[in-house]
A protein has these predicted regions:
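Kelch-like beta-propeller repeat domains
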Residues: 1-276
Length: 276
């Protein structure tokens, strides 16, 4: 199980659970054109629930957990060309951060800190790659981790996620406007969930998968930002959580993840969704 981002026309999966370990430094890229995977230089520090985002010519990796969904680290790295570079550390060790590029910055929202006292946080940072510095912005309305995030038309959409545990999932949906430093409530997602995929595709925000109490979700729901409404689409062929979901070209690619609750069972499945 690993999170992903689109970088240079490919799906890049970073870190995750694999081979009976929870802190793999793996870095794989999938090319939809050739339907092939490539193993790339590994992360300097392995972890799960690594926050990933692409901006400009670099792929960024923020934090992550060194144990199963706990014990985070504060390392930050950027991949460019054929190697990883070490960047300024996070202000505090954190995992399961929602990361998205907007303009010349990367927004880092929510996540979880701690080990024995693991808890969700409401922080909202922006990372400036040109200066290698962090700034603080208005915190998210409710501290969560495992949320979905996407930037559309100059604002950030933050969708669902968990408060400390998947037993307390949220259906909240807010937008953040960087010009006013304010959050605004939007139509809540019909299915409260966490560990889901969230992407922008054909003028809508598509959300798929995720987990909750005693179940893994296969529902696919899409949000229309113009009408502020949600609608349902075809469910996933293989319901999963903790997968990498990325739009490349005219399709959504959903790779890896867990077909059962928790991290005990992993999947290597890669499936695509597209509209006619």
């Amino acid at each position: 199980m690993a999170w992903a981002a689109e970088y240079r026309g490919r799906v890049h999966l970073v870190g995750g659970y694999a081979e009976q370990q929870v802190d793999k430094p793996y870095h794989h890229a999938y090319d939809p054109g050739s339907d092939r995977w490539e193993e790339l230089p590994q992360l300097p520090r392995g972890a799960n629930h690594v926050g990933v985002a692409a901006l400009g010519n670099r792929l960024y990796a923020f934090g992550g957990f060194t144990e199963q969904n706990r014990n985070p680290h504060d390392g930050v790295f950027a991949f460019e060309g054929e190697r990883w570079h070490t960047l300024r550390r996070l202000p505090e060790a954190c995992g399961a951060i929602a990361c998205v590029a907007l303009g010349d910055e990367i927004h880092l929202i929510g996540g979880a800190i701690g080990t024995d006292n693991r808890r969700s946080i409401d922080w909202h940072l922006v990372y400036n790659p040109a200066e290698d510095r962090y700034g603080r912005r208005q915190p998210m309305p409710l501290g969560r981790d495992h949320t979905g995030v996407v930037a559309v038309n100059g604002v950030v959409h933050l969708i669902a996620g968990r408060v400390d545990s998947f037993h307390t999932n949220s259906n909240l949906h807010h937008t953040y406007n960087p010009n006013t430093d304010e959050w605004t409530a939007r139509a809540p997602i019909p299915t409260a969930r966490s560990g889901h995929g969230t992407v922008w595709y054909r003028d809508r925000i598509f959300v798929m998968g995720g987990e909750g109490t005693n179940r893994v979700y296969g529902q696919t729901e899409a949000y229309d930002p113009v009408r502020n409404t949600w609608e349902s689409y075809a469910p996933m062929l293989t319901p999963r959580h903790g997968m990498g979901a990325v739009t490349v070209g005219d399709a959504i690619y959903v790779a890896g993840g867990g077909p059962q609750m928790g991290g005990g069972v992993k999947s290597a499945i890669n499936e695509a969704f597209s509209l006619a």
